[in-house]
């Protein structure tokens, strides 16, 4: 996996002294080497302190180069924390990036590309990072063990919300959420390829190269801003050239292929069905502000025929006392800062590792001029290579020993070492490079439910059943030797291309020196001093695991939730295996027997804005305008959002003091003259086919085969559970042709439901369905003069008299000299009324013609408020009554239900609970005091009984002031309501503080005989 060659070349050469570069002092910057641009300096700030770095740095490497070790405080105990890793697995160095509305909390310093003017701040501290008063809480740490919130702060109970919870919330947490609306823009994009390669380390580069040479369409995703992965940290040779030069050559060849897309700064965060992957591209996160009209980030939906997972492996920390102190780092991270960034993490180091791979860090430290004080190897046998390494670096070799604890506060000063003979000693140091082995980065291989498999040879989990079309290679598969990684990647890329029809052979693998990553597991150091952390981000220690086991939380998923192991923003990348191993050790089970936790997307945190793309604010969903919108806007209409639609709520005129006056005026106009309302938002579904009548019989609870052509019928649709789903009218336009209308709110849901019924339940029926909601403009023309108005625009050859077009009839007509239209004699207002449908492109012209023709009749436009008042006056059920909890019987539709046939919801509608006579049913209510105003949601309580849940008999669902009756009226659901006509109740609205006496009455307040609508 790494190389120990001392041949470095100019690109990664090292000096033993640190000197300022580009005239800017950076006390821990090596004098030469690294993949940074020393010709330029980038100013940045950390906690208000101005510092400098170079292009090619991350924030973490720049902090290391400036000698900054303390970068944060821990989640629960507020312990000093430094930088642990050099990649996306970082659990400790979490900072706030930027400020104001662009502030981004909990950002990993190791993944932030340094840019000019970068602002970063530590978090979870007060008043300062160096002096955090909240750290005093460590005194109470015995009371803050795993699950403490279930066992402490329980008395007195009244203190929880007012005292305990606020204190806990103030003490815990990490960053602060941004203030204000996010000013940045985001995009969503789609990509398609033959082969997707995830990760650009040794295996990833070879996989992409093999696939690209075959002619396949290849996408190579790398979350870093450079390709190469751990090759960027290597000091050895690959095929005779320095590792970074090898990476540059392969990258240049990949970019030369027209069908290869190399995507740096792009994280694959999720694996989904059918070869679909989610990726986040950080388009402009590496600069202070995105350029105008460019996104900050872009969310990709990538569809790949084959995928090669070459995401590498994550180094595990060792579990010993105070292993979280600043200056205690992963060995691989130390190599990264030395070799890639030319930043020295310390001056005197102790290397503590249980595997051969960590020998490389000792060589690199020595080459960089860092004194290697000790090599602590817990393995009992002493290898000749270890002796040679100690001699080369001048380090003391402590074979069979362990580090029991780190000593220091804001930075490590020394370590306590227990040797094989039991003797303890102290070794002074300011850097501990630790390595507990490696865990293959297999998260993406398990997102679809695949379970990883334990591999004893590497002491880690490897991918088991990978998603269809995915293959893992290299370190992600548990292969750590560099030569084997190169070969495995080349083979996997060639096989992926071959599987999709491209003939190729694996690319030739360059020669490299053989390596060893042999590991002897050490899951924790026994007898350690101080807290030994397993999950650094959530402050979970080995003692927490022991406590969870004692309290019965031995299951992996229980352990995870009780201790919060692996539940932080890093998802336990460095913690999970160690936590499982400690539980296995305590319970005397193997790790496979203990189990493995479930990995879920996203792999790393993803900004919500990126997932939304342009769909934010008013663009969250498209706004739909009615055909008469421009005309209504010109009339000064006030609009209201109803679902996705923007509808006219009312039309204010001179003299109207408020919406209330405008609404009353519009209602009176309809009741006395004629009004026009745009009802195009109602769902309209065109149904055709020989089996259309049978289809309607099954989806509606009432009968449809008997409906004649040219007639309209009201219908009620039930859900499978027997409750009312939707209602509306359906017109029979021809023997096999129907037009169904739905409520505005349920238009999409009903269409989806009908499609399901057709395609899944009854695919044998000869019927076709299509939504025509946006193809037809529909206007309600209501009032005693509505026929006169229509006669002015309907062409004379069409007879629309009461005899020719009675109530609930429909007809094809032409208007305005030949314009095709549909006329329906239906009424929602209770007046003589029609609905006129015309092709949508003519909707604006028709509304203008109607208003022009109706001037002599006193025509008035009316909006949603007046429409609602008139439907309450007539007792029609709508949204408040169709709440998903009412049955057809509750709403008075029992006679509609054709129980002699089968229909959706029939069986469940006959359940005893739904036929209970005590159910709440639809009634009308009016106040005893005509001046009182009812409110929706008021609860019905019998007179002279306490107001409590036991005496709650129902509630009002819709209320309105009726200008026709000059009184407030309402609809409601009342227990045994039909038996209680004339009874007096209290309508109690505790929220608004009202208590009104009402009388129960029929739900139809106006013209119950229907004489007006049949006139």
Show the residue positions of the predicted features.
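Acidic, proline/glycine-enriched N-terminal capping motif
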Residues: 578, 585-718, 723
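Well-ordered mid-protein domain cores that form the structural environment of catalytic cofactors
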Residues: 705-736, 740-756
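Residues forming anionic-ligand binding surfaces in small-molecule and nucleic-acid pockets
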Residues: 221, 313, 553, 664-680, ...
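Residues forming the flavin
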Residues: 2-49, 53-623, 775
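A short, contiguous, amphipathic alpha-helix enriched in charged residues
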Residues: 61-71, 690-707, 788, 792-797
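Structural motif
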Residues: 46, 97, 642, 720, ...
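Short amphipathic beta-strand starts and helix->beta connectors
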Residues: 457, 517-520, 665-672, 717-727, ...
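Conserved, structured C-terminal
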Residues: 629-634, 647, 734-736, 742-1015
